Amino acid sequence: MLNIHNEWDERYSQHDHIYGEQANAFIQDITQKLSIHGKTLGLAEGEGRNLLYLAALAQANGQAFEADLWDYSQVALDKAQGYAQQRGLSLNTRKQDLSQVDWPANQYDNVICVFGHFNPETQQKVLNGVRETLVNGGLFVGELYSTRQLEYKTGGPRAVEMLYDPIEFLSHFKHDHLIHFFVGDVERSEGKLHQGKSHVIQFAIRIQK
């Protein structure tokens, strides 16, 4: 049986832009309201579509942007680097098992996570780690599938424990400022694997330490 790293390598080897070439729709929407620039970490960011969108936007606005991409798959990381070079953008990549991170404190201005789904133990580690690694006033932004997504069968893991409960998710950020928080139905068309009505959690959270 393939291990998780090789499963993701195989998935990313099969097609280009398996989750689409454009950034996630919520990431595009929230940047109309929030300026996301500075040192930015993309978690489980695959081929880099969201980070590259943010990097290009910051460049167009004359803002500094440093992009770090962490993912399980070396194939995805290599493709992300290639796409960055094609667009004249800079991207730092790291092959990272998110269950085994020594999170650096106060390191990032922003963390983004779009459809980054993990087992319950790793979910806890990641959400706690995100808060640790963001600076005071830093932003955590993203879109995830909620536990109700199992009913929809339009993308994401097929095990409920890999999905997110909104109340449990919020418990990690009870001292922080919710700029945007939405739980409900959206239509998504992002590559072959995310198609149709979906039940998501959207968030933009400003960390207050």
What does each of the following model-derived ranges do?
Residues 1-35, 148:
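Conserved class I S-adenosyl-L-methionine
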